[in-house]
């Protein structure tokens, strides 16, 4: 998916133009106001959507009204969630080219809009022989381009972490995660079993006894000149967790590989 920053989204010949609506207010689209609000009494509650054709009156084919709820209650996180829902709806309609017209929002929505858009685009289909072709390919929005590009990098990192978490446990082994960690260009130290024993990491090693895979304790360090403070982030990296003494039920089998998500 490619996000393009433009000045006039209504001039884009999109498959769908997404317009936001606050409760008790109208949209920028006269067609949406006439049919969604006046005829069908669409309220614009948070997360609700209303799709209608433009009947050839506009360059874009359809309008998707996206409810944002009460204006006073809209937060950046809620905007990200709403954007996610809008993209998913556009994917259901097999739209390839989507434009967003976000009006009346009282904060810079560039980052959260980008995050919601790209998170909605995520799917792990690496091992599927048949892949669905219902993705939105182009998204147009009027936003801060610098913030959009930065948010794209954050979303790419999230995608990378999700891909690691979704890999089968026989492939995403402790040794494989250690190899990946060493490729990031950070100061990285991988501690083996013997080194962990010397540090008294009994609980960590007790978990490792349940696997034929060798344990790897990964320590990554990012340094800058004259740091104001030190921050330690600890992420659980159990690559397959069946529950230990309390074995998880069969219904939890699909998520046993997810226990390394924080480390990813």
Give residue ranges: language-model regions.
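Alpha-helical metal-binding/catalytic segments enriched in His/Glu/Asp
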Residues: 181, 231-233, 246-264
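Short amphipathic alpha-helical segment within the helicase RecA-like ATPase core
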Residues: 1-237
């Amino acid at each position: 998916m490619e996000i393009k920053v433009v000045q006039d989204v209504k001039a884009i010949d999109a498959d769908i133009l997404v317009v936001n609506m606050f409760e008790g207010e109208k949209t920028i689209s006269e067609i949406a106001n006439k049919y969604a609000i006046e005829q069908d009494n669409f309220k614009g509650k948070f997360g609700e959507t209303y799709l209608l054709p433009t009947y050839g009156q506009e360059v874009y084919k359809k309008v998707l009204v996206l409810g944002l709820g009460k204006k006073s209650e809209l937060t950046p996180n809620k905007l990200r969630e709403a954007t996610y829902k809008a993209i998913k709806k556009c994917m259901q309609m097999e739209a390839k080219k989507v434009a967003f017209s976000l009006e009346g929002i009282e904060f810079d929505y560039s980052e959260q809009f980008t995050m919601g858009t790209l998170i909605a685009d995520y799917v792990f289909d690496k091992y599927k022989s048949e892949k669905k072709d219902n993705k939105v390919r182009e998204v147009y929005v009027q936003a801060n381009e610098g913030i959009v590009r930065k948010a794209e990098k954050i979303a790419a990192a999230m995608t990378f972490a999700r891909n690691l978490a979704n890999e089968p446990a026989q492939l995403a082994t402790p040794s494989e995660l250690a190899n990946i960690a060493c490729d990031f260009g950070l100061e990285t130290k991988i501690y083996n079993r013997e080194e962990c024993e010397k540090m008294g990491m009994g609980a960590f090693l007790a978990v490792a006894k349940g696997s034929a895979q060798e344990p790897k304790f990964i320590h990554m360090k990012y340094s800058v000149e004259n740091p104001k403070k030190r921050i330690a982030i600890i992420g659980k990296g159990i690559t397959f967790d069946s529950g230990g003494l309390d074995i998880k039920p069969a219904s939890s089998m699909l998520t046993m590989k997810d226990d390394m998500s924080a480390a990813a």
